[in-house]
């Protein structure tokens, strides 16, 4: 099953997440099919917090991909801002 979820990057105590399309059996930070955006939880000021390619997310949802809970809330936030 294909899932759209967060993959952690960044350094210790400074998380940065890639929003990726991956097989649900793959490890969290392991192999993925496509990168569709990023999420920076520590963003402040003029720094961009979330960027999501909504066209690609909708494409994968149409092909049966499921969203993780956190990614679903980020997509909803991005759709509201767009």
Curated annotation (Swiss-Prot):
Taxonomy, superkingdom: Bacteria
Keyword Ribonucleoprotein: yes
GO CC term (a single one): small ribosomal subunit
GO process annotations (BP): translation
GO molecular function, one term: structural constituent of ribosome
Record's keyword terms, sorted: Ribonucleoprotein, Ribosomal protein
Family assignment from sequence similarity: Belongs to the bacterial ribosomal protein bS16 family.
HAMAP family linked to this entry: Ribosomal_bS16
The protein, known as: Small ribosomal subunit protein bS16
Source organism of this protein record: Histophilus somni (strain 2336)
Lineage summary: Bacteria, Pseudomonadati, Pseudomonadota, Gammaproteobacteria, Pasteurellales
Gene name of the encoded protein: rpsP
